[in-house]
């Protein structure tokens, strides 16, 4: 028996080396290693198409090799956000797939958001099992960067489709997802792709205290996701009497790669998607790139206009100024590790119950 600490440490190291050697013989080289042999200096990400949301995520976008969930009420912008992620991935030369379980993808709208629909791989599966098998094949190919499943609620188990309309099928979808995610999690990590689940909200019956909202598909998806985004419409944007878009808020209710409970606000314009000009104005004022006095906005002692919509019109016609402001905003965020100061609304999230 070793008589001093150094000899004991040496014996432990020999035992560990022997164990590692046996594991590699049994499971192959690379099955186990010390972290310094495979260091990760920076998380690889894909932009969401929103400057504010990229900042709120803390790493500059959605992390690759992870499972993401985007959930919210109807017509809140879930699919729009997912399509923007696809467009950003394609700009980097990535391949993307869209599993249209709802059979409701608007191809013309996707093109307006910048998605190259000619290069987009699309599937409209008949059952939930078929959808998850297709996803597994795509992930294991290692050739796809982003896969979007729209939506979890539409992943109908085969037994439910083949049964009668009034039959009760308790927990079938939850078991389907639980089994599928157990297989997909490691495959997604090895393939270094992003798997996005779009999910809907349901109401719990009989809840008096606390949040009655929940998402479909059971609890498995909540555990396996690295990032969960709660997207909501908080207002409308009007041009005189016509409604031209929605004011949108996204809360990062779960984040395994950066501090959670941050939020981002941006505009989603009809037939246009996320308004980059609106974000430039809001983020510019927040970070001090733009000067705001009352309703007036200024940049480098030049008045841009009165009111947010007038400033958006100015920046739309003066693209060089808009690009210059955007560059300064991104530089500031990069110098602060893509994180902005959490505002009062975000601080309140720490005290809310997240389902």
Swiss-Prot record:
GO terms for molecular function: ATP binding; ATP hydrolysis activity; ATP-dependent DNA damage sensor activity; damaged DNA binding; single-stranded DNA binding. ATP binds at residues 72-79. GO terms for cellular component: cytosol. Its main location: cytoplasm. Keywords: ATP-binding, Cytoplasm, DNA damage, DNA recombination, DNA repair, DNA-binding, Nucleotide-binding, SOS response. GO terms for biological process: DNA recombination; DNA repair; SOS response. HAMAP family: RecA. This is Protein RecA. It comes from Wolbachia sp. subsp. Drosophila simulans (strain wRi). The gene is recA.
């Amino acid at each position: 028996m070793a008589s001093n600490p150094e000899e004991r440490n040496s014996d432990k190291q020999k035992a560990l080396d022997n164990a590692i050697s046996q594991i590699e013989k049994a499971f192959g080289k690379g099955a186990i290693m010390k972290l310094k042999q495979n260091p990760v200096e920076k998380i690889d990400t894909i932009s969401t198409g929103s400057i504010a949301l990229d900042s709120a995520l803390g790493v500059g976008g959605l992390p690759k090799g992870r499972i993401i969930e985007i959930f919210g009420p109807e017509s809140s912008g879930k699919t729009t956000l997912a399509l923007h992620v696809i467009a950003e991935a394609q700009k980097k030369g990535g391949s993307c797939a869209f599993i249209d379980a709802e059979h409701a993808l608007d191809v013309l709208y996707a093109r307006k958001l910048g998605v190259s629909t000619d290069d987009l791989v699309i599937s409209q599966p008949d059952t939930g099992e078929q959808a998850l098998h297709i996803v597994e094949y795509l992930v294991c190919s290692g050739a796809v960067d982003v896969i979007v499943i729209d939506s979890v609620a539409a992943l109908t188990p085969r037994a439910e489709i083949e049964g009668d309309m009034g039959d009760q099928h308790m927990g079938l979808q939850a078991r389907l997802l639980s089994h599928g995610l157990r297989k997909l999690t490691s495959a997604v990590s090895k393939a270094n792709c992003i798997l996005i689940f779009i999910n809907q909200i349901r109401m719990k019956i009989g809840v008096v205290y606390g949040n009655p909202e929940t998402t479909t598909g059971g609890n498995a998806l909540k555990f396996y996701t690295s990032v969960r985004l709660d997207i909501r419409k908080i207002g409308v944007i009007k041009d005189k009497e016509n409604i031209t878009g929605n004011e949108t808020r996204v809360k990062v209710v779960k984040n395994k790669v950066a501090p959670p409970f941050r939020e981002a606000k941006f505009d989603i314009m009809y037939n246009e998607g996320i308004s980059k000009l609106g974000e430039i104005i809001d983020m510019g004022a927040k970070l001090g790139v733009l000067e705001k006095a009352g309703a007036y906005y200024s940049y480098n002692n030049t008045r841009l206009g009165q009111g947010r919509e007038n400033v958006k019109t100015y920046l739309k016609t003066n693209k060089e100024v808009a690009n210059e402001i955007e560059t300064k905003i991104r530089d500031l965020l990069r110098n602060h590790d893509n994180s902005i100061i959490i505002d009062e609304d975000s601080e309140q999230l720490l005290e809310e119950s997240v389902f």
